[in-house]
Every structure is written in structure tokens, then in C-alpha cells.
């Protein structure tokens, strides 16, 4: 497999590849990595498993290669993004008709739209006229009966939000250090994105949908996936880098009504993710004496012993620093969670199957 190049471990390649670039996320990996692994696998009986589907790089690449793939994703919002990226047989005429309907809906309801409906966070990121159009576009999607087209348009709307803000709505962070030069014009930007997406799937419409995605926490076995049915696991797991994947999507989850506040993010998003940030838990709930008696610690005694040594060292170092981050606790939770992910992943893969991570 000749796929190694300087950007293979980043998402830069994906920014220039149709479908992959529909939803951009900086913490990713190149689609070329997946395609190189699956080269020559088209029409084979092999199945790829992706425990951290994210923005769908593995699933989209597998489908482009004609290889069956199954993925788990813990965030409801990202689940819809991935589904939309896998629907390539979209009727262009019906989609254009839906665009025209949305335009009419906005014009009909614009005057009577109440700014009280707007989430406080979003009111700081967009001007009022843009917010009205964004929210009315969102509301109009409830009247689109075709599920695939509705998700297709929802994805386009999520990307419109990046284009029309007062500030760069970057993932993973919101930057307020500079203002966007060309903010606003929400419907025109939305329409342009939809038309580009339709153009992108033109050459792909005869490709069978071979990838499927489940809303599921990969720390636990997915009952929809049988034992030993997958041949490959191709993924980029969450890193121990204190990046809060629940927090980074808050603009979208607040906008689409999935979350309202910090507690919602914890209860509805963070609880379904591998512990990768100190915001995922309360320090007061952690007891190292209880932790050392759990299944992870008992079944991995040598690993636990090494972690415990680091736990003490990090705790001592923290006393000399100004920050209050409990990285020692974060480390323990992370390794415990990843142990359960690896266990469930191993169970659905053939014994001795390739695991490219």
C-alpha cells in the first residue's frame, strides 16, 4: 500500500474531495488512507467496521470503493451528517423543488419571526436578519417529506452556518478575534451549497449504498452488529488531548434543538463519548480505590500498575501548576473507556483480522 504522504494523518485531503468536504472537521485523517487499504476490495465480501464514525471519512470512502462498511457514532447530530453524506441517489428535480419551497416559506414567515426563538449563543454569532433566515430554513425542513432530501438539506444548512457568521465558526473552536468579511446572505449561500452538493453526487448516483451507520456508543457492543462479521477496523480514535467533542458541536446542536445548555451537552452528548476531556466528569465522583477494583483494572493489572504510577506523578506535578485540570483522573477514565472500545471492536471482527488505526 503506497499511501503514506505528509498529510495522511490530517483531514487536509478531505477539504478538496467531493462529499468528504461537505462537513469539515480538522481532527481527522485522509480519505486516501482508507482508499489505499481497500484498493482491490471492490465487490469482495469483506466488511469494514468504524467505531468512531465522526464525519464519515471511513464510511464514505468504503462506499466509493464499493465495500460494505458499518459504523457507530455517539452524537445524534453527527449521525444525521453521516447519513446525508451516504445518500447519493438524490432526485435533483425534487431537491430543487424543495429549495423553491424553502424560499417561499422564508418569505412568508420572515416578517412575523420572533427573535425570542433564537438561542442566546447564536445571537452573538450572527446578525438578526441572518438568524431569521437560518431559523426559518431550519423550520421549513420539517415540511420536507422525503427523509433523504431533508437530511441532505440539513447538512447544507449546517455548512451555511459556517459561511454566514459574523465570526469564523470553526470546528473545534469559535473564533471571535476577527470578523468575517462576507457574512450574511444566508439563503443565497444555502442555495449555492445545495447546488454544489447536487453536482458532487452526479457521478456517484449509480454507486450502491454499501455503508450503514448506527447511533451507538462503541464502549458497548452494538446488538445490530453480529459477532466476527467484520474484516477490517479503520478508524481514528479520540485522543487523550482534552478536546471536548461534546462542546465543539454546540453551535449546531443548540441551533437544531438537540441541546440548550451545558448540562444538556453533558447528558445528551458527553455521556455517549469516550472520556477525552476534563469536562466529561466531576472530580468529586472519582475514587482511585474504587477504580482499582473495577473490571478494567483487574483484567489489566500490569497496565493499571503503570497508569497508577503516572496518576500519582501527574497529581504531584499539578500541585506546582496554576491550572486546576485533573489530568490524572482524565487519563484513568480514557484508558478504561478505550479498553471497552477495543473489547467490543475485537468481538465484531474476525479473529486475526487486520486493524488499521
Segments predicted by a language model, with ranges:
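A short glycine-rich, Lys/Arg-flanked "PGG" loop and its adjoining helix->strand segment in the class I
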Residues: 335-351
